[in-house]
Structure formats: C-alpha cells, structure tokens
Amino acid sequence: MTARYGFGSISFPNKCGIFLSTTKNFIAPNFPIHYWTAPAFELRGRMNPDLEKNTLTLKNAAAVAALDNLRGETITLPTEIDRRLKPLEEQLTRMAKVLDSLETAAAEAEEADAQSEECTRTEIIRNESIHPEVQIAKNDAPLQYDTNFQVDFITLVYLGRARGNNSPGIVFGPWYRTLQERLVLDRPVAARGVDCKDGRISRTFMNTTVTCLQSAGRMYVGDRAYSAFECAVLCLYLMYRTSNSVHEPQVSSFGNLIEHLPEYTETFVNYMTTHENKNSYQFCYDRLPRDQFHARGGRYDQGALTSHSVMDALIRLQVLPPAPGQFNPGVNDIIDRNHTAYVDKIQQAAAAYLERAQNVFLMEDQTLLRLTIDTITALLLLRRLLWNGNVYGDKLKNNFQLGLIVSEATGTPTNNVILRGATGFDGKFKSGNNNFQFLCERYIAPLYTLNRTTELTEMFPGLVALCLDAHTQLSRGSLGRTVIDISSGQYQDRLISLIALELEHRRQNVTSLPIAAVVSIHDSVMLQYERGLGMLMHQPRVRAALEESRRLAQFNVNSDYDLLYFVCLGVIPQFASTP
C-alpha cells in the first residue's frame, strides 16, 4: 500500500495509507521513525559518486575563497581603523585646546573677581553700609533700611528716644492714639501685647497699624504674575504714547517708565480736563459685590466699572479693549472693522518691558483691573497733594525733624551739609511737580527694584490713612468746614478689626486664624480705601480742604515738608518730655 501525507484537503483513494498532520507539529505530518534512513535515500547517494565528489569540490573551493577574502580584509583592517579614529583624535585635540582656554579664562576670572571683591570691600568700607537706600526730599540725605522701610523707620524713632517701647515721650497724632485706645477697649484679648501704660503709644501697635495700611492695596485672593502697580504704570505709559507720539521720551526698561510717571500723569490729567465734562472717580457700587472686592468668575456685572472716569478714558484711548457687552453686535462690527479693537495693548507692553512669559488680560481679570484703576487714581491724588509743595519753608514750622532722629539714633552729630532739612531761604518757591518727580526717581523706583511685587499702598501708607480718614470727613460734613475731630476711631472699625487679627496672628499659629474672616475684613478695608480715594479726588482743592478742616493735624502734619514725609512713612513722630 502506497503511503500519502496529507497537508490540505484529504481524499481517500483506494489502497492508500494516509498520515494526518497534528497540532503538535503544526503543518508537518507525523513521519514514521527512521523515515529518512530508508534504503531509498541511502541508495540514491551511493548510486551517484561523481555528484558527491563535485559537491565536495565546490565546498572546498568556497572555503578557500572565504579564507582569501578574510585574509584580504585582515590586511586592510588597520588602515580602516586609522581612517575612522583620525577624526576622533582631531576632535579630542580641539577639545583639549578648548579646555585649556577655559582653564586660562577661569584663572583670569578668579583673579578679576578677587580684584572686584577687594574693590567692593573697599567701597563698602567707604560707604559703611550695603543696605538699600531711598530719598524722599531733595534737600535731605538718603535713608537706608533693612526690609520694610516704614517699619524700620518706626524702630529708629523708638531707638532715638533711647527707651525703646517703654518710652511715653513719642506721639504720632490724635488719629493713631484714638485707634490704640479703641483697640484696647474693644479688643482687649488682641491688645495684650500692646504696652499702653502711662499713655504711651506702643511700638508693636504702630508697626502693626502701618503694616495694615500697607496691605490695603494688596489682593489676598488669587495668585497673579503682575501687580496692579505695574499694570497702572503700563496703562499710563500707553495713554501717553497715544496722546504724545511725537514727544515720546526714550525708555528702555520698566524703571525708566517709573521715572517718567509725572509726565504720564500730567498728560492724563490734561486729557481728563479737556475731554471730560464731569469726572467721576467712583464705580457703580450697585452692580458690585457689597462686602467683597474679588470678582466671582473674574468679571463683575456689566457696567460696574465703566462709570469710573479713569476706566472710561482708558477705553476711549484704546489702551484697554472695550468692556464685554459694552456695544451691541451691530455697533461692535463697525468699531472692530479692522479686527484690532480687542487687541490688548497691556499684554504687548508687559511682554516688552517686564518679559515674564505670562499673560495679562485686564478685561478678563477685572479684580486686577479694578485695583489697577484704584492705583492710577491714587497716583493722581498723590500728584495733587504734592503739587507746588514748598519743602524749603521755615524749619520750626515742621513737626518732622529728620536730623534730630538720625542724630539721636546713631549717636553722631548732625551734619548740616548732609541733613539740611527745610532752610527757609526759598519760602516762596513753587515746586510744581518737582516733588513728585523726585519721589518717582529716588523713592518709588528703588523700592520697586528691590521688590517687584510691591503695590502703591506699600510705598505710601500715609496716603491710605488719608483715604480711610475721608469717611470721617464726609460724616462730619463738608471737607472745607473748619472743625477739629479727635473721635475718628469710631469710623475705623474695619481697620481696628484688621489690626486685631494681625496682633492675634503674631501670637498664634497661622493655621489657627480663620482665613475667611481675614479675607472678609481685609476686603472691607480695601473697599473703604477705594471709596475714600473717590471722595478726596472729587474735592477741587483737596490739600487746602484738608488743611482748613484740620484733618492733616490729626497726623501731626503741619507743613508741606511734613506732608511729603507723611505720605511716604505713614507717621510723623514727635518727641515729648516725660511727665
């Protein structure tokens, strides 16, 4: 019987044995054992010896050829290795030369650094200090400080009295005294660390109060890459470019923008005077959250901010894009015909002068926009307060005597050349905008350089105090009314609450304070500061009104020289004899 091995379809012819494939050997059939040693295969090789001889001859010839090829490759192998190693050796040679050059340069740099350190050490010894310094009045010496300029100055004042916090002979005016008395009466637990025995004003209380005044322009909610002060400077600069493209000053950095702030504010005031019939420095509070500064979802209700004249001017000059929903769809197509009306110029200016690779769209973050408008308004108010201020008047009319404080603190005699103070020689001198110009160059710019996140209220806590006190003036009647009011503490409940929380924070852990309560009280102080800004800006002669109503006397301010230092320091100290 003939054997057949099935791989595909299987048929059954007659007299055939079929060997089926299995899954074990996949497609190969299950061959019988010793199948390939059958006589048929053995006899086939033995029957053709010539074929076997030819096969062996060919195998030998192939082996000889392979050996010849191997011998030839062996001969050329060193040459090939040299050819491939030569570029690597050249690269190593170049790297060695570069390393030698770097080593030489490093040695020269170390030598130069040593010389530079020696020069720096000599310069430090010459200057006797490496602390940052600012200067407020042109006819006074610069002031050096460590971390917080205002707090360090208060510490200097108490050291100057030579008794530290135990001295009853330092007064800061009725406003601060009333705040301390109200704090002790209303918040006795928080006031445990306040030493007010024998009528003394506590240094702890003064430091805490000034710190709270500085925080009135900072946002406690959210983390932003740009401060409101930076956005305000950029807005004023873009407005200036739009109005004075021909006479634009050359600026290369954000510090230069700060130095030119008086020109920008002057142009802004001229524009407001020319194009606005009646300026309004208040928002539409009916459309704003009542007790909250932060905007839910990033935006307030439509029309909540556009009632402010500063906001309206920035939109009209196309510094800011139109507010969402400000125009109907048909009108919007006409205004945005070139598809450029909604391009945010602040974003471009921030990229050019700040270079932080972060977006800033004020119309999308209207909480930051609101604080930016407040900062611009505060700059305008500061300009009005310092306009034509005479810092060269009679010295004895000034309650602030810098020379006395510095002399007492350092234990060295006062240098009349360095600490001139007011001279009385130029009593009729009209400074115009010079005092504000000098502050921008020697006070605001250095403070910003040292702290890029600083806000305007941190630089001018005295300005915040005047804005908070404006509510007292409103409740007592017209700003021009001549009245002495020393009961202003009852109108500062929000500020007293914030001071109490800060004092408790210093005695307890951070996690033990209610965050929601801190944010709520801080927002109430921010809102009071914002409303006070509007009240003071609506006064046609704000400085004269403050003087006539004796509101400046609440802070020991008696002259233009005192006012200049008060807006920067937040306090005007006076030494009194011990009773």
From Swiss-Prot:
The keyword Iron-sulfur does not apply. It is found in: Virion; Host nucleus. Signal peptide: none annotated. Keywords: Capsid protein, Host nucleus, Host-virus interaction, Viral genome packaging, Viral penetration into host nucleus, Viral release from host cell, Virion, Virus entry into host cell. Residues 1-50 are annotated as: Interaction with major capsid protein/MCP. One of its GO terms (cellular component) is host cell nucleus. It comes from the Viruses. One of its GO terms (biological process) is viral genome packaging. Transmembrane segments: none annotated. The keyword Transit peptide does not apply. Its main location: virion. Capsid vertex-specific component that plays a role during viral DNA encapsidation, assuring correct genome cleavage and presumably stabilizing capsids that contain full-length viral genomes. Participates in the interaction between the capsid and the tegument through interaction with the large tegument protein/LTP. Belongs to the herpesviridae CVC2 protein family. Heterodimerizes with CVC1. Interacts with major capsid protein/MCP and triplex capsid protein 1/TRX1 at the pentamer vertices. Interacts with the large tegument protein/LTP. This is Capsid vertex component 2. It comes from Varicella-zoster virus (strain Dumas) (HHV-3). The lineage of its organism: Viruses, Duplodnaviria, Heunggongvirae, Peploviricota, Herviviricetes. The gene is CVC2.
